């Protein structure tokens, strides 16, 4: 008989900053973009200057406002990056040119495994906004090392034509937690994308059932699964005919038919049953459920937890099912883990022809911001007094869901390192990831058993 797994890990949810306060919400929808970027720059500027003193040398650079820049004088300016990409589609142009905003071009069966990327152009350029002024950047900077919304310090000179020639870039300082030794296993799945139709969901449901059984079999073979301290289910849990990342997706979401809205309700019932059944397994200690864009919660980053009324069975077992934010950060015995549903990374990949998912996350660590493309190409709640998506501490592990391919990378940071993992959609691959906390090794397991 199976015996329940007793978890000895000290768990702590450290996602408080992703929860919006009443102060954040007050007057939110009267704010402009510049207030969001202003708050971001205000928080990151001291860390950029701190890093500049370490990398360039204290007293070896002149920190100046862009408005005070003189031609051919080397100065250090801190500001926000803006990437001007000619091929980037405009929703305003689409509204003017198409009555239905490309809704007729939506393909029901279109493959979404690969990220659609913007084609490069000689018209593409990089600008820096600082002190309510904008200047074009050239020199020691490329389109593949920055993104719109990044805060950076640039050391260089203002040229004759009003172009700033960059000699050196300085990013915010990085705070890395101490190394810790932890024994245990955490499992991760992402992108269930359930539709509520049993035929459409057949492979996903059978894969989840297979995974639940595999995690609870106590047999002595090489495929034996260790006791699972936590299972983290990364959204989206339900399929919405949309990925929320472009004009067609927005229109598709706004024009769902009655039948499609009904299917969303049915899919929630399916999700509730499956997650609750997994949580009841004796060898699974706790299930964390984090939402994605399209799930029944706000689609503006950071996403709040799904309300328990949407998952009533899970709500009744609150000790084993934990409804959390997106992004979601937690610690187990001091080991810090961050998960995110991946819309931020998918949007970043659109702006580069070279990046992989791991490249994008490595840049996120360098920029010290989870989603610099908020609120430019990714919906974000307009918080003005603070930026909840700034990385105060770089986690030991970052798991990014809903990516085209499985991928991982160890990124060295000041004597420590961060493990970044790109996790594909379970609905398409039936692949789950098992993280060994003692050595941060990964086990990829496929639960696709088609006959």
UniProtKB/Swiss-Prot annotation:
Keyword Lyase tagged: no
Chief localization: nucleus
Keywords: DNA replication, DNA-directed DNA polymerase, Nucleotidyltransferase, Nucleus, Transferase
Pfam families, alphabetized: DNA_pol_D_N, DNA_pol_E_B
Domain of life assignment: Eukaryota
Subcellular location: Nucleus
Coiled coil ranges: none
Entry's Gene Ontology cellular component terms: delta DNA polymerase complex
Reactions accelerated catalytically: DNA(n) + a 2'-deoxyribonucleoside 5'-triphosphate = DNA(n+1) + diphosphate
Entry's Gene Ontology BP terms: DNA strand elongation involved in DNA replication
Molecular function (Gene Ontology), one example: DNA-directed DNA polymerase activity
EC number(s) stated in the UniProt entry for this protein: 2.7.7.7
InterPro entries from the UniProt entry: DNA_pol_a/d/e_bsu, DNA_pol_D_N, DNA_pol_delta/II_ssu, PolD2_C
Main function: The function of the small subunit is not yet clear.
Subunit-structure text: Heterodimer with subunits of 125 kDa and 50 kDa.
Family: Belongs to the DNA polymerase delta/II small subunit family.
Name of the protein in its database record: Probable DNA polymerase delta small subunit
Record organism: Caenorhabditis elegans
Upper taxonomic lineage: Eukaryota, Metazoa, Ecdysozoa, Nematoda, Chromadorea
